[in-house]
UniProtKB/Swiss-Prot annotation:
<dbReference type="InterPro" id="IPR005371">
    <property type="entry name" value="UPF0181"/>
</dbReference>
<protein>
    <recommendedName>
        <fullName>UPF0181 protein PC1_1931</fullName>
    </recommendedName>
</protein>
<comment type="similarity">
    <text>Belongs to the UPF0181 family.</text>
</comment>
<feature type="region of interest" description="Disordered">
    <location>
        <begin position="54"/>
        <end position="79"/>
    </location>
</feature>
<dbReference type="Pfam" id="PF03701">
    <property type="entry name" value="UPF0181"/>
</dbReference>
């Protein structure tokens, strides 16, 4: 789920796509159409409770002592 957006049923998603396509056929840019439909959806669902689930790895909850490194595959330059 995108922050601030309610979870939508498949039918609601399909309706949103059709609304975006309708706005675009009237000459609106895709970005503007998406933003407008998102605002309409937020307005319709204002005050609704949205269930949020966070997926956390149990083994990394208290790993603040561990160091993490990123290997980009590049050789490091020696100075």
């Amino acid at each position: 789920m995108i922050a601030g957006m309610p979870a939508l049923t498949h039918k609601q998603q399909q309706d949103a796509v059709e609304r975006i396509q309708e706005l675009m056929s009237e000459g609106m840019s895709s970005g503007q159409a998406i933003a407008q439909v998102a605002a309409e959806i937020r307005q319709e669902h204002q005050g609704d409770n949205v269930a949020v689930m966070f997926d956390e790895d149990d083994d990394t909850v208290n790993d603040s002592d561990e160091e993490h490194y990123f290997d980009d595959g590049e050789e490091e330059d020696e100075q």
